[in-house]
Amino acid sequence: MVAALDTDTRARILDAAFACAERYGLARTTMADVAREARLSRQTVYRYFESKHDLVFALVLREEERIIAAVHVAIAPHPDLRPALEAAFVTALRWLREHPLLDKVMATEPSELLPFLTVEANPVLGLGMRLMEEVFDARAGNVSPILTARAAETCARLFISYAVTPPAEDHEVVAETLAELLCRGLVKKR
């Protein structure tokens, strides 16, 4: 029961941080704002997150976990690699473009988010890589683990790149192209 309360409180704080960031922007959001929005004391917020930096990073990771959940749903009906990759890319690209906060932050205060997607990106990259390794492992056949890991890292890095700079072309076109390139590379390198 205590663990559930801790998880609920953590989620409440993250929801409050999201709402405050939408309302005030990331730079202007304070821990006091988050505490007020969550209807908790500042001390409670600080018990869960030692700094605003930690809170924003946790928020970034939670939003990435939401993308991953959406991608899992999208790829589930696709036992073959290419359609699964297309579904993964289309879902992620749409999710990134439709995210209520991402475009706003990238347009008005990119310096608040970019560190989590560049110099401090290892946890973000790791989550994306694990997702894509699952996709490749389940669908790529006899591809070496090293090549699978490299392809997964490439995909994760592309997702981060598209989060920072959206593609100029339609999501479906980008997804088809990326899936084609990856599948050709994997088949050729077997």
Identify the function of each model-found stretch.
Residues M1-Y24, R28-E37, D54-F57, R62-E65:
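Basic, helix-initiating cap at the start of DNA-binding domains
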Residues T7, A11, D15, L61, ...:
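Generic detection of well-ordered alpha-helical segments
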Residues A16, C20, T44, A70, ...:
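Amphipathic alpha-helical interface segments
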Residues A38-F49:
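Short hydrophobic/aromatic patch on the recognition helix
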Residues A58, H72-E98, A152:
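Hydrophobic alpha-helical connector segments
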Residues E65-I68, L113-E153:
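Amphipathic alpha-helical packing segments from all-alpha helical-bundle domains
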Residues L96-N122:
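Amphipathic alpha-helical segments used for helix-helix packing
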Residues K104-A107, T118, A138-L182:
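Hydrophobic/aromatic-rich alpha-helical bundle segments in the mid-to-C-terminal region
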